């Protein structure tokens, strides 16, 4: 699927989006404008990246409200707050589930975003566990007619934001937070079919 306008273009190895009927899968989009130029500021790059995602979503006949999951890659994780404030502007009604990852290098510039959109909004709902601090930019989970999308869950204490020194305690906290989202949707850990753990060098794989 290729939008009629925008910076996304297909080649032998890449499609901007794939429409399989119930879902539209949007490939990682960078911040280049349709003419190939790159915005100068980071905030402008975030906006252009989301505009590029939006162009593909709309080419499928959908809106940003149909987006249920996004994955954001940042070269400088220190710019998270700046990205986050702009991100929320694109999802004013029902923000998607989301993972934000710090990476050593993105292909085009400092940010890349991939996404999944659902075609029917009939059964789409955001999932919030009890006492969860609401966010304007993402939902802990999004439930559709046939699957659940869960945001990345960090190994920090949800009430204080503190990250334990013990790696095993971080794993427990992340899994507890994941379980709380599933439970709020009426699901259990046994219902999960895919999980993607992200570790830093400070987290031994055998502990996770």
Predicted regions and their residues:
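N-terminal presequence-like segments and the immediate start of the first folded domain
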Residues: 1-51, 55-69, 74-194, 199-208
């Amino acid at each position: 699927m290729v939008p009629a306008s925008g910076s996304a273009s297909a080649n032998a190895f890449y499609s901007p989006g794939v429409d399989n009927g119930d879902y539209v899968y949007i490939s990682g989009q960078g911040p280049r404008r349709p003419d190939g130029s790159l915005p100068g500021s980071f905030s402008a790059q975030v906006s252009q990246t989301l505009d590029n995602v939006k162009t593909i979503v709309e080419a499928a006949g959908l809106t940003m409200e149909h987006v249920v999951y996004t994955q954001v890659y940042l070269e400088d994780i220190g710019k998270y707050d700046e990205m986050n404030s702009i991100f929320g502007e694109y999802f004013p009604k029902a923000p998607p589930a989301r993972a934000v990852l710090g990476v050593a290098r993105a292909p085009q510039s400092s940010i890349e975003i991939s996404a999944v959109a659902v075609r029917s909004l009939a059964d789409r709902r955001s999932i919030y566990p009890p006492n969860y601090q609401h966010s304007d930019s993402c939902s802990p989970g999004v439930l559709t007619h046939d699957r659940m999308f869960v945001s990345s869950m960090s190994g920090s204490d949800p009430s204080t934001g503190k990250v334990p020194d013990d790696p095993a305690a971080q794993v427990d906290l992340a899994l507890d937070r994941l379980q709380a989202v599933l439970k709020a949707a009426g699901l259990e850990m046994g219902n999960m079919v895919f999980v993607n753990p992200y570790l830093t060098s400070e987290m031994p794989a055998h502990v996770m």
